[in-house]
Amino acid sequence: MASAAEAVEELTRLYRELPPRPAVEEVEAAEAVLASADAEEAARLDEVAREEASASASSSAAAPGRADGELLAVLREARRNAVRLRALQQRKEAAYVVELERRFKVFDDLIQRASRVVSSSSDAAEAGGGTTGDGYVGVGADSVDLEMELRKKEAAVAAAAAVAEMERGSKGLAALGLESKPISSLRRDVSAGTDMEKLSLIQVASLIESSAKKGITELSLRGKLVDQIEWLPVSLGKLQDVTELDLSENRIMALPSTIGSLRYLTKLDLHSNQLINLPDAFGELSNLIDLDLHANQLKSLPSSFGNLTSLANLDLSSNMLKALPDCLGKLANLRRLIVETNELEELPYTIGSCTSLVELRLDFNQLKALPEAIGKLEKLEILTLHYNRIKGLPTTVGSLSRLRELDVSFNEVEVIPENICFATSLVKLNLSRNFADLRALPKSIGNLEMLEELDISSNQIRVLPDSFRCLSRLRVFHADETPLEFPPREVVKLGAQAVVKYMNDLNAARGTNQKKTDRGSFWTWLFSLFGCCKKNQEVGLPV
């Protein structure tokens, strides 16, 4: 039977041999990871079940053969097994931390029990002056020495643990360029390799815990997550003091509903991920001003999206959106809306309620028309519709009194409404590449006196309207692959101002009842333009 001193010595040795104890933040992070892994596993299994039900319904009409049926059953089980294995892998590191902390708590209890035993033995020895019934030495100094020895060793262990934690905390994740420095015994050694510089799920959760306790206001994880992280931990909602959050350039597929707790968030960057949808709680981010969701896989927006009433800048480009929700009209403070490279077939009529819009980019979609309500966007300055299927513009486009740039190139536009000439602030107008459809410009195009750039390339326009002469500010004019006959191609090649001067001179000539300009008079005009007119006979030109 070991003596009390030997028992204390053995207990102390065992305690010293334990691995480093995880910090509180690490334990909380591990618990958050386990909760997230459970939620992700359940969601993925539900998705597999829905896919199976859909496939079963579609194949019910044509019953598969026995071999095919067995293969499908094997495939379904393989999918479910893959989901469970993925969840197991995600839980592995977190489960170790949680179990490690549980074992440390057991040791804490054992240490306390040992301390109580020694203390009670010491008290009994002092009172009785002899040997206790438990066999411990009862007289005087021996039991006191044992208690002092135990306490001394406990203090030594605690000091060693504190030093270890300080050493770990001094390194943290600073080498990764992150603002917060959580104490983490699970930190990977940062090497020159790109993969080794990224964070595992539990490291992300630990960083969130530490950042939340420090009350940080800005956090960037741009490109910092390992590729295996597709779901963020539910503890993300603890970052309640954060105003700017950058999660871009990762492989995130889903956000936890707890993101709605980030009530002070004003800027959120999620571009270049794999987001399929947004949680309903997303609409609770009522202070959000800047939101970047471009380059994801979004197919729809939640109905709560209209609650983001502070939103000023929204980038939804390069997704898979086929429609925008009607609630978009509630975003009265929205100034910049980018929805390029989606699958939009129409805009909601409520777009007209976004009266603060200054910039609207809809390039590379499947739009066939614009709603008349577009004319209510009185502050709109930029409207781009490049590469859609639009056949005509609404007459209300003339109400866009502040419009400076309009691009309807690569469409199927047949007629440009005369009303567009009331948009007298236009500086840049691109009507190119409507190919066989567009045959004429508005007769009143000369009203656009601020126009500096005009592109009518690859259309079927043959004649410019007389009012073209009023475009005195025009400095760029493109008409490539457009069969212009009037003015002649030679004039167009000389540039925008040459065309304007030609139209002016022609109008003046008509005003003095001169005959219609023919080929000979064109050459006379051309040489007068350069101040080098000579007699036709001297240069051999036709008369």
Curated annotation (Swiss-Prot):
Per the entry, what induces it? By light.
Q: Name one Pfam family in it.
A: LRR_8
Gene3D superfamilies per the UniProt record, alphabetical = Ribonuclease Inhibitor
Please give a single GO biological process term from the UniProt record: intracellular signal transduction
**SUPFAM superfamilies listed in its UniProt record:** L domain-like
The protein's superkingdom reads Eukaryota
Q: Where do we find the motif GVYW here?
A: 495-502
LRR repeats, residue ranges: 239-262, 264-284, 285-307, 309-331, 332-354, 356-377, 378-400, 402-424, 426-448, 449-470, 472-494
Q: Does the keyword Repeat apply?
A: yes
Tissue specificity here reads: Widely expressed.
Keywords, A to Z, come to: Leucine-rich repeat, Repeat
List the PROSITE patterns: LRR
**The protein's role, per its UniProt record:** Leucine-rich repeat protein that likely mediates protein interactions, possibly in the context of signal transduction.
* Family stated for the protein in its record: Belongs to the SHOC2 family.
Stored PANTHER family: LEUCINE-RICH REPEAT-CONTAINING PROTEIN, PTHR48051
Report what the protein is called: Plant intracellular Ras-group-related LRR protein 5
Native species: Oryza sativa subsp. japonica
